[in-house]
């Protein structure tokens, strides 16, 4: 369904990402226009009207935003934060259900999707703060008082970080398969030690961004996504019969690697967080309810909910398992996921 209004074409400036110089512009078949078209294809089957706009924040940056049912004023808005390597388009299976009786906002995280892609700090704590402040500035710009904040993967980590710093703005925190909560286990404590060849490969790849391979692959990058992640096409098969989803993921991740570099600066080898959230979440305001949603078939450690409960023994913490779902819970079992999220939201108002 067409959007109600689009104020400008994109939060980006320039037809091509600035870092793609020399031979790379012809090597990587992408541009901000390609990403815009890919996003529009992702959203064309969303069964409700919405408004899309770039929200201006500090330093000339913009946060690309979708608003659903924003004219409903008596319900706390639900705000969706996507995960690493994603964008707001990946919520396409969820918008219709979630916005039936409350405002829903989704935006591309700073450095991802169609939001601005600035240079981030190299320090993990400062990177985290840059993300958190961009969310707070976005909230202020839209005039939202309080939010139900939902984050998947990296978005879950940032939603928790935001809730720690701005507790008065969060009525409920929903963590969906959150990244970055446990500490990296000591190799000596692991039942299955990491093979030497994997450690060697990890050391060799340390100077590079996580998705650099897609850009190095150039015109073969899209087929690489299709080969490595054929499951994404299946997840969205009820909405698209073609390669719409993989094209969107490809164009999201071959632009300037701004958020990707920021994520790398927040990690230590093998994807663990430099500043694990479980070390801090016990300091979260006790009145903030937390719901943790995970896929019963996910390969990610699903014990974060139990750990959070032990660290917040006098606060509301609930863990919800979605049967038949993996890490991408919202796409694997969208109807069940949407229902659980709506039930959580109904406890707020």
Swiss-Prot record:
Reactions this protein catalyses: a 1-acyl-sn-glycero-3-phosphate + an acyl-CoA = a 1,2-diacyl-sn-glycero-3-phosphate + CoA; 1-(9Z-octadecenoyl)-sn-glycero-3-phosphate + (9Z)-octadecenoyl-CoA = 1,2-di-(9Z-octadecenoyl)-sn-glycero-3-phosphate + CoA; 1-(9Z-octadecenoyl)-sn-glycero-3-phosphate + hexadecanoyl-CoA = 1-(9Z)-octadecenoyl-2-hexadecanoyl-sn-glycero-3-phosphate + CoA; 1-(9Z-octadecenoyl)-sn-glycero-3-phosphate + octadecanoyl-CoA = 1-(9Z-octadecenoyl)-2-octadecanoyl-sn-glycero-3-phosphate + CoA
GO term, biological process aspect, one: phosphatidic acid biosynthetic process
Family (UniProt): Belongs to the peptidase S33 family. ABHD4/ABHD5 subfamily.
Organism: Pongo abelii (Sumatran orangutan)
EC number of this enzyme: 2.3.1.51
Protein name per its UniProtKB record: 1-acylglycerol-3-phosphate O-acyltransferase ABHD5
Record remark on domains: The HXXXXD motif is essential for acyltransferase activity and may constitute the binding site for the phosphate moiety of the glycerol-3-phosphate.
Gene3D superfamilies recorded: alpha/beta hydrolase (3.40.50.1820)
